[in-house]
Regions:
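Core-facing hydrophobic residues within beta-strands of well-ordered domains
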Residues: 15-16, 211-212, 220
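Alpha/beta-hydrolase
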Residues: 37-197
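C-terminal alpha-helix
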Residues: 235-242
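Catalytic histidine-centered segment of alpha/beta-hydrolase-like enzymes
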Residues: 180-190, 217-229, 233
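Short catalytic/ligand-binding loop motif for oxyanion handling, primarily in non-cytosolic enzymes
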Residues: 2-4, 26-29, 161-164, 222-225
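Conserved hydrolase catalytic core segment
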Residues: 1-38
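A structural motif corresponding to the C-terminal end of an alpha-helix
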Residues: 144-148, 201-214
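Hydrophobic/aromatic beta-strand patches that form the interior of the parallel beta-sheet core
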Residues: 19, 153-155, 215
């Protein structure tokens, strides 16, 4: 999603259609509040940036293909699929194999970060994959002003916990749940309304002459194309044909 947003902003004339599948907010991941995507400060405060769970990083480094809760298999299943969805073992093995090819470190995944004395204890850095999602680097809300205006199909899963208005990867949500201590409260640091921010930018796009459709797959989480493949293909065909 983040790549598609950016490509559309940079090269709108090359697009005939744009399909956004469970896209990242056009204001980046973390570090903003409200549907207008206001940053807390220029440092990207509130965004995890290049920080990742140390236990997950350890399991990646060990090439762990097992069932440990912090190993690639379990993390992929929790992040991509709705609870209880029957994951095909062969496909799951393929996803795990591909994830374990990732390069680790400050120049790769997750990147570097700056420690912080107060909540949320980290600030985004300047290197690596995850920092590319921080709001000071990833703001593509200019999409609302692109011209020409390719039609947009936005597909999201109703059970998505990765890109959501209550994302389990949002430091504010983790603070509310007590996973990250010292949460200052919802008034000071509310969860990022990722879905609301996407809709707000697409509504601006519509006001500027574009058009979009929002489709919610009720039985899907982050991977609607895998969880409801028949409907997904039908919707794509109809969108391209229309």
């Amino acid at each position: 999603g983040g790549v598609a947003w950016r490509y559309a902003v940079n090269h709108p004339e090359r697009l005939t259609h744009l399909i956004l599948l469970s896209p990242m907010s056009p204001y980046g991941f973390g570090g903003t509040r409200g549907e207008e995507g206001r940053m807390y400060d220029e440092r990207g405060w509130g965004s995890p940036g290049g920080f990742a769970n140390p236990a997950f990083l350890q399991k990646l480094g060990e090439q762990d293909r097992g069932d440990d809760p912090m190993a690639a298999r379990a993390v992929l299943e929790k992040s991509l699929f709705a609870a209880g969805w029957p994951v095909d073992k062969a496909w799951q093995d393929l996803y795990v194999d591909e994830l374990l090819k990732i390069h680790l470190g400050e120049d790769y995944y997750p990147g570097d970060y700056q420690p912080l004395a107060e909540f949320p204890y980290v600030l985004p850095g300047t290197r690596g994959i995850s920092n590319a999602l921080a709001p000071q680097y990833a703001n593509v809300s200019a999409f609302a002003q692109i011209n020409p205006h390719p039609p947009v199909l936005w597909i999201r899963g109703a059970k998505d916990t990765l890109v959501s208005d209550q994302s389990y990867s949002d430091l504010a949500v983790l603070g509310q749940l007590g996973v990250v201590p010292g949460y200052p409260g919802a008034e000071a640091f509310p969860p990022q309304p990722m879905v609301g921010q996407t809709r707000a930018v697409l509504e601006q796009y519509k006001e500027n002459g574009g058009r979009y459709s929002e489709l919610v797959f009720e039985h899907s989480a982050h991977a609607s194309h895998l969880e409801e493949p028949e409907r997904f293909v039908d919707e794509l065909k109809a969108f391209i044909a229309g």
